[in-house]
Amino acid sequence: MAKKQSILSPIIRITFTFLVLCGLVYPLIITGIAQAVMKDNADGSLIYNDKNEVIGSKLIGQNFTDPRYFHGRVSSIEYKAEASGSNNYAPSNPDLEKRVEKSIEEWKKQNPSVPVTEVPIDLVTNSGSGLDPDISPKAASVQVERISKLTKIPKETLEQLIQDQTEGAALGLFGETRVNVLKLNLELQKLLK
């Protein structure tokens, strides 16, 4: 019996020690470092309006349906963050073909002047998460004609807006050149006022 207690005692102490270290101390240290070094990222990269209300995050896409605004990527989860993920159909899956055809039909309705062959792939396909906040600069540019026609904002102004909101690859190496749709639409909204 005494031998059992001598074995259990260190096990219980080690378990408790690691519970405190890994469950309390480590998370608090990492949270403190994140808040000190990169507060914006640690808080979720939130975007605020003029009234200091949260209107979104730079990291999570939103569904823009108003034809006067730029539209993001297709999302099979309708941009619901709690349902993150996508129906990652294989290229041979007929459901993928149906989904892409549906996206193309919607595109044609809203952008009749742009040939389907010029529609960038990121406007008719899902991202892996279904929450991608960015599109390619080309995907933004092909929407300029529709937006200009509906808002009466000159195409050149919209193209400059896209250029101003275009971000390069991280550290010049990682990722693609991209445009954050929420940030782009917020700048567009300023022009509409």
Curated annotation (Swiss-Prot):
GO molecular function, one term: P-type potassium transmembrane transporter activity
Subcellular location field: Cell membrane
Principal localisation: membrane
Membrane topology: Single-pass membrane protein
The entry's keywords: ATP-binding, Cell membrane, Ion transport, Membrane, Nucleotide-binding, Potassium, Potassium transport, Transmembrane, Transmembrane helix, Transport
Segments passing through the bilayer: 14-34
Example of a GO cellular component annotation carried by this entry: plasma membrane
Function noted in UniProt: Part of the high-affinity ATP-driven potassium transport (or Kdp) system, which catalyzes the hydrolysis of ATP coupled with the electrogenic transport of potassium into the cytoplasm. This subunit acts as a catalytic chaperone that increases the ATP-binding affinity of the ATP-hydrolyzing subunit KdpB by the formation of a transient KdpB/KdpC/ATP ternary complex.
Family membership: Belongs to the KdpC family.
Subunit architecture: The system is composed of three essential subunits: KdpA, KdpB and KdpC.
HAMAP family associated with the record: KdpC
Full protein name: Potassium-transporting ATPase KdpC subunit
Native source species: Bacillus cereus (strain ZK / E33L)
